[in-house]
Amino acid sequence: DSDCREGICGSCSLVIDGTPQGPHQVTSCQTYMRDFVDGATIKVEPYRASAMPVIRDLVTDRSALDRVIQAGGYISTTTGPQPNPNAMPIAPEVQEQAMDAAICIGCGACVAACPNGSAMLFTGAKVTHLNLLPQGQPERTDRAFNMVSQMDEEGFGGCTNYGECSRVCPQEISLDVIGMLNREYRKGAQARKPKHRAKMTAQ
């Protein structure tokens, strides 16, 4: 893994004293020993989620999250001259909402904290930050549907509104991204339904 020690690569996927990434809502690599009581016993474990199996010792396999990204967490572009970015104005509030979701580091703490092992917060963050920006519009209809389908295929559970994911997220990502994911998924599913012509009866 990256071993960045800056809280941005997500590879420090540990459960500290029963809480994914530790009790201070920061990444494990940014947790200081001074934050704990002198002489206390600290219990460090790997994540426990069926979709993220333990490889060895404290290392878990988070590649399922990468495959969810590969299913739709990208934008398409062409080579050669590109449109002027200034020609695509984005409202400040939309920009802030997109950037608040884009800070997800894919650490998997949300999955480890969820009683269902759900990756809805992670997937919702990726869908939200791309779907709100002009560059993400070409794949918007299919993105959420494809990513949720891959999430299900990887064995992640469904969301039942516990809210533990957002509570432990070191980037403090809001549950609002799950609402966006659900809305976009329904749109994608609706677009896949066959369109039937209404039968007209002869008068």
Language model segments and positions:
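Ferredoxin-type iron-sulfur electron-transfer modules in oxidoreductases and energy-metabolism complexes
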Residues: 43-203
